[in-house]
Structures are given as C-alpha cells and as structure tokens.
Amino acid sequence: MEKPTIILATSNGVGMGHLARASAIALALKEYANPIIVSMAGGIAEIPEFMGIRCEYIPGRDRMWMSREKWDEYLRDRLLALVDETGARVMSFDGVVPYPGVIAAKVSHPKLALVWVRRGLWQKKPQRFVLGLQSQMMDYIVEPGDFARAYDFGPTAERKDARITASVSLFQKDTALS
C-alpha cells in the first residue's frame, strides 16, 4: 500500500519554532507517510539535505512583493497546486493565526482535512478575538504540550477544542550522540 502524503505548512514566525516543530513531526511521520514541509521561513532551505524530507518554500507576505489580498490568493493557489500534484488528503498548518490563503485552500478543496498545530501560551493580543471562529474552520486541532503549561493563562488555556499532546521536539534521546 502506498503511503499517504501529508502537507505540513508553517508560517514564517519570528524564530524557528514552527519550522522546527513541523520538521520533528515530519521525521516522526516518515515511516507511515510522505511528509512535505511547506514554509514561509527561509530556514527551510537546509531541511531537505539534512533530513531527507521534501520541502517547498513560499515567500511570506512579509516580503511585501504583493498586496495582502494577492498574497492570500497566491498562497491558496500554491497549496492547491501541491495538493493536486501529490494527492495529499491532509494538510496541517503550524502558526499562531491560519492565513486566509490556508483557509481558502480548505474551502476550495472540501475533502482536504485541515489540522491546526496551535501552540498554547498565547498572549492577550488582538488575534485572540478570532480564535473561536478560526478553530471552527479546522477539522482537527493539535496543541503540542509545553513545559510551561502550568503557567498558561492565555486565551487557549481553557479551550477544549484541541487535543493536547506530548511536547514536540527535534531532540531524540535515543539518537543523541552524547
């Protein structure tokens, strides 16, 4: 039986957390699926050679090469092209706020399952006001566990719409060199 293709999309983010988490998930999936990481983070260029995982780079809207509306259409079209090319039936998005282009890809391809990898420890910023609506647009929400979870008093702390998992890390004790 052929392994299914799963697209793991990440936002650009400020650091490398979204991309590192998607990389760890992709490594864990390799035995069971064909993961493809799609990211707006420039660091994605190092992953294919290092991890043996297919990656696609999509320049983020922060590049300001086009208007926000055009970029959302561009993102939607790039994601849909990848879904059509690979036959993927599942796409995850790891980022604080799912871009309209990600949601539009799901709306355009209703059989595509959309999973939000939504970290906890949200700050009380304006994004929290659309949290409920964005959550309803997802087929599934995964919240990776965090060592500081006991100190999470943000807008996701009391929500019951996510499956909380163990923490997700690239570090694997059994493969560490020392």
Identify what each model region corresponds to:
Residues E2-V14, A28-R78:
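Conserved nucleotide-sugar phosphate-binding/catalytic loop shared by glycosyltransferases and other
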Residues T5, R89-S92, Y140:
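Structural motif
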Residues L19-L29:
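Histidine-anchored nucleotide/phosphate-binding helix
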Residues I36, V90-F93, V115-V117:
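Short catalytic-loop micro-motif centered on adjacent basic/acidic residues
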Residues S39-A45, Y99, D146-A150:
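Short, polar loop motifs at secondary-structure junctions
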Residues L80-P98:
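Short N-terminal targeting/anchoring amphipathic segment
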Residues H109-Q172:
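Active-site-proximal region of nucleotide-activated glycan assembly enzymes
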Residues Q172-S178:
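A short helix/loop element that forms part of the nucleotide-sugar donor recognition site in Leloir-type
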